[in-house]
Regions:
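Transmembrane helix-loop-helix hairpins at membrane boundaries of multipass inner-membrane proteins
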Residues: 1-6, 20-117, 193, 197, ...
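N-terminal signal-anchor/start-transfer transmembrane helix
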Residues: 9-29, 218, 225
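Alpha-helical transmembrane segments and their helix-start/interface "positive-inside/aromatic belt" motifs
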Residues: 30-42, 163-173, 370-373, 450-458
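Hydrophobic alpha-helical membrane-insertion segments
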Residues: 39-54, 172-181, 383, 419, ...
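Hydrophobic transmembrane alpha-helices and their helix-loop junctions in integral membrane proteins
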Residues: 99-107, 124-136, 149-428
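Cytoplasmic juxtamembrane regions at transmembrane-helix boundaries
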Residues: 102-118, 242, 250, 441-451
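Short phosphate-coordinating micro-motif centered on Lys-Gly-acidic
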Residues: 143
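Cytoplasmic/organellar membrane-interface segments at the starts of transmembrane helices
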Residues: 370-372, 426-494
């Protein structure tokens, strides 16, 4: 199977499956659309698994490389490859696609084919982002992935879905304009090449590095999102359907952080070191201030959305400490957040489907009518708070340890988020699951169905498996992280 174009399959199998699902047409064929979507998502995951089993963990080089000309006039190539960093996100994305298809199985009743096709097409585009080694190819996938998510929020979202979708699209597009200008500059500066690896190797004077870094920062900070360009995220999460929130939290938020690793750090290493104080400051604001903001939320989705911003603050903090432990911890946190945030939003969706409210005050006593759900919800709430034994603990602990070696006060501020995380997550859990019943609908609730049990079990396996045995994840990324840090430790100024 190693001779197959695995990365092309990871991209085009979901996209082709989405187009096939679209052909089922009206909602009269919705059972067929759901079945084809699930089949396409499963095949999409299966074609990514050989990336892991056939991966050489001792090599930092790009593997499973595919290269062919695309637009010869501008030297734009269809150039794909993965290393120990990007490969994990291709597999995570394909896994999450199965989750969202199952999650929307009986929940979405209108435009079922279009809904499922949107997720499948977006899955392929996201895999393209993680695999692209050509700057323009990366940009095409990067921008195209906005369209399905925009439609998912705008068509199947809540009452303010159009506002939320437009705000999401506008914020991201503004950052992307500077990103495009940077790509064109690098193309001209390199003598007419869009090869990302060539950009990473060529010397660049300090002033252009600074401008490139700041342009990349604007583009990727919106995607993470970092404070203060985070305001689109709570609105998008609140209005998005459950599947949209899962993909947004589990995968889409990783694009900005991934951009730092592929562009900011290796292309502008001197500027990255010079502006590291800025990133560390913004990261600590996200970790501490946004944690306090989450503490006062009454809407469960908004609370988890703000907690995602705080958790992603750990990621950018880990990157710009410039240590192997910090960067590996940040990457573990990214993968872990995919399981945990996806599970938290799914748990909220399970309750919303029954009570049609996201407000904490409308719940209470859920454990009495939904004991199985309460047990799953407790597991994911504890993981979100960073309980040892769950994946939420591993990445945060690694970043905090790296921070201690870097600066005690940075580590102290970062560690405070574990207290804040426990406070706002367990406060929400206590009021929703225990206490007095706040809504007569709660008294009539039925426990989770077999479909919901399956989704929660799959996510629980991810959160617990990674928490109890993280080595399969860290082992894969170790060589790539070491090579990246070695690369950015050498000045490119000549």
């Amino acid at each position: 199977m190693s001779g197959l174009p695995l990365l092309s399959l990871a991209i085009w199998v979901p996209i082709f499956s989405g187009l096939v699902v679209l052909l089922t047409g009206s909602d009269r064929n919705s059972p067929l659309a759901r079945l084809l979507a699930l089949l396409g998502a499963i095949v999409g995951l299966l074609v990514t698994l050989p990336l892991y089993t056939g991966f050489d963990t001792t090599s930092p080089a790009m593997q499973f490389v595919e290269l062919m000309p695309w637009i010869r006039r501008f030297n734009i190539n269809y150039h794909l490859g993965v290393d120990g960093i990007s490969m994990l996100f291709v597999i995570l994305n394909s896994f999450i696609t199965i989750i969202v298809v199952i999650a929307g199985w009986k929940v979405i009743e209108s435009k079922v084919a279009q809904y499922n096709a949107g997720f499948l097409i977006m899955s392929g585009l996201l895999n393209g982002i993680f695999a692209a080694l050509d700057g323009m190819l990366f940009y095409v996938f990067f921008e195209a992935s906005l369209i399905p998510l925009y439609l998912i929020i705008g068509v199947w979202g809540g009452p303010r879905r159009v506002y939320a979708a437009f705000k999401f699209f506008l914020f991201t597009l503004m950052g992307s304009l500077l990103f495009l200008i940077s790509l064109i500059y690098l193309y001209r500066y390199s003598g007419g090449s869009f090869a990302i690896q060539a950009w990473q190797q060529m010397p660049i004077p300090m002033i252009p590095q600074q401008w490139l870094f700041l342009a990349f920062l604007v583009a990727f900070a919106v995607k993470v999102p970092m404070w203060p360009v985070h305001t689109w995220l709570p609105d998008a999460h609140v209005e998005a359907p459950t599947g949209g929130s899962i993909v947004l939290a589990a995968i889409a938020l990783k694009l900005g952080a991934y951009g730092f690793l592929r562009f900011s750090l290796p292309i502008a290493p001197d500027a990255s070191h010079e502006f590291s104080w800025l990133i560390l400051g913004l990261s600590l604001i996200a970790v501490v201030y946004i944690g306090f903001v989450a503490l006062v939320q009454e809407d469960m989705k908004k609370l988890v959305a703000y907690s995602s911003i705080a958790h992603m603050g750990f990621v950018t903090l880990g990157f710009f400490i410039f240590s192997p432990l910090g960067m590996e911890g940040a990457l573990v946190q990214m993968v872990s957040h995919g399981f945990i945030a996806g599970a938290m939003f799914y748990c909220i969706g399970v309750m919303y489907d029954r009570v049609h409210s996201r407000m904490i005050v409308d719940y209470g006593g859920v454990v009495n009518t939904m004991p199985k759900f309460a047990a799953f919800f407790m597991l994911f709430a504890m993981a979100n708070a960073g309980l040892p034994g769950t994946s939420g603990f591993v990445g945060e602990f690694m970043v905090i340890l790296a921070s201690v070696k870097f600066n005690f006060w940075v580590a102290f501020a970062a560690a405070s988020t574990m207290i804040l995380g426990a406070a706002y997550t367990l406060w929400m859990y206590k009021r929703v699951v225990f206490g007095a019943v706040g809504n007569h609908h709660v008294e009539e609730l039925t426990d989770i169905t077999s479909r919901e049990f399956l989704v929660l079990t799959l996510l629980a396996i991810g959160a617990l498996g990674m928490g109890l045995y993280p080595q399969p994840f860290t082992e894969v990324m170790h060589s790539s992280v070491d090579e990246l840090l070695r690369h950015i430790s050498v000045s490119k100024i000549q």
